[in-house]
Amino acid sequence: MGVDIRHNKDRKVRRKEPKSQDIYLRLLVKLYRFLARRTNSTFNQVVLKRLFMSRTNRPPLSLSRMIRKMKLPGRENKTAVVVGTITDDVRILEVPKLKVCALRVSSRARSRILKAGGKILTFDQLALESPKGRGTVLLSGPRKGREVYRHFGKAPGTPHSHTKPYVRSKGRKFERARGRRASRGYKN
């Protein structure tokens, strides 16, 4: 008698809809589902996929990073599209005129973009303006920017590991003995 095929790993794990029950997000999903199906543009498919993503996979994009990315050659007069939040950066003094589209824009970032003569679109306005994503630049925030990523990687204490250990506090008595001081065994 043959062994039956194992079906336990058959399922493809990817989101087919957003986890959130936010009705406005669901409406955007409806709109971009239609656009992704009816247009042959990859832009709409990428936006749809990103609308499904979790909060940690939609990290906020700072104003400074957006300005830096939009200054690159060939990106003049294009719309910056962010499936996520745009936040303010106080380190930036001059904000150029920008045209942006995002799910959310923090209040200070909003006032600074508009003060510079820029324009802020929502995704439904973007769908009317460029249904195929023409004249847009898709941007996203740094996914590995969260503090938790510092704890990932090679175990702390092993050679060439720069992983942050989970320590109660950073005092003299905490993870400062063997392997950290030459007087206590060895130091690496």
Curated annotation (Swiss-Prot):
Phosphoserine, modified sites: 130
Molecular functions (GO terms): RNA binding; structural constituent of ribosome
Species whose genome carries this gene: Rattus norvegicus
Composition-biased stretches (Basic residues): 161-171, 178-188
Primary site of residence: cytoplasm
Assigned keywords, A-Z: Cytoplasm, Endoplasmic reticulum, Isopeptide bond, Phosphoprotein, Ribonucleoprotein, Ribosomal protein, Ubl conjugation
Disordered: annotated span: 150-188
Localization per record: Cytoplasm, Cytosol; Cytoplasm; Rough endoplasmic reticulum
Keyword Cytoplasm: yes
Subunit-level organization: Component of the large ribosomal subunit.
One BP annotation, GO: liver regeneration
PANTHER family xref list: 60S RIBOSOMAL PROTEIN L18 (PTHR10934), LARGE RIBOSOMAL SUBUNIT PROTEIN EL18 (PTHR10934:SF2)
Primary role: Component of the large ribosomal subunit. The ribosome is a large ribonucleoprotein complex responsible for the synthesis of proteins in the cell.
Keyword Ribonucleoprotein: yes
Covalent cross-link site, Glycyl lysine isopeptide (Lys-Gly) (interchain with G-Cter in SUMO2): 119, 164
GO cellular component, one term: cytoplasm
Protein's UniProt name: Large ribosomal subunit protein eL18
Modified residues (Phosphothreonine): 158
Family affiliation: Belongs to the eukaryotic ribosomal protein eL18 family.
InterPro entries: Ribosomal_eL18, Ribosomal_eL18/eL18-A/B/_CS, Ribosomal_uL15/eL18, Ribosomal_uL15/eL18_sf
Domain of life: Eukaryota
